[in-house]
């Protein structure tokens, strides 16, 4: 009976430790960009585990002054995303537009992308020895570019 209690305590302790050290968390960052032709609201949900970023979900809403401006913006965005997906993989995106409003959704899974190809597009990326972003470094980068992160 005493051995069973000891084994139960050990198993529970290991489960708790495993949960604490493998806990998946996220932060959100938002940025609003405005000029005379359009307003862009960007929302980033950054998932990390053990301080390493493994996925980012991006949702952007664009409201343009005219349909032509929106079409140009959305075409540029879609071309960029298409190139990223072809070059680095695991870059899932969706682009929608209606009149003068557009929406994009992107999911970047850093565990599945070709990081060498990614670095060609993002040579300034500050990655750790595992070729991953550290959550604090990525948060700092977004904040330096005007985003508010929580």
What would you call each of these model-derived segments?
Residues 2-3, 135:
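Short amphipathic alpha-helical segments that mediate assembly, nucleic-acid/protein binding
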């Amino acid at each position: 009976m005493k051995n069973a209690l000891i084994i139960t305590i050990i198993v529970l302790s290991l489960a708790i430790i495993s949960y604490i050290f493998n806990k998946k968390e996220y932060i959100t960052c938002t940025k609003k960009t405005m000029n005379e032709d359009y307003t862009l609201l960007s929302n980033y949900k950054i998932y990390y585990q053990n301080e390493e970023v493994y996925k980012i979900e991006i949702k952007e809403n664009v409201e343009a002054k005219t349909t032509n401006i929106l079409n140009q913006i959305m075409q540029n965005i879609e071309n960029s995303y298409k190139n990223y997906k072809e070059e680095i993989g695991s870059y899932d995106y969706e682009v929608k537009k209606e009149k003068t409003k557009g929406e994009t959704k992107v999911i970047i899974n850093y565990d599945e992308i070709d990081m060498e190809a990614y670095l060609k597009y993002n040579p300034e990326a500050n990655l750790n020895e595992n070729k991953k972003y550290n959550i604090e470094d990525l948060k700092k980068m977004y904040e330096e570019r005007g985003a508010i992160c929580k």
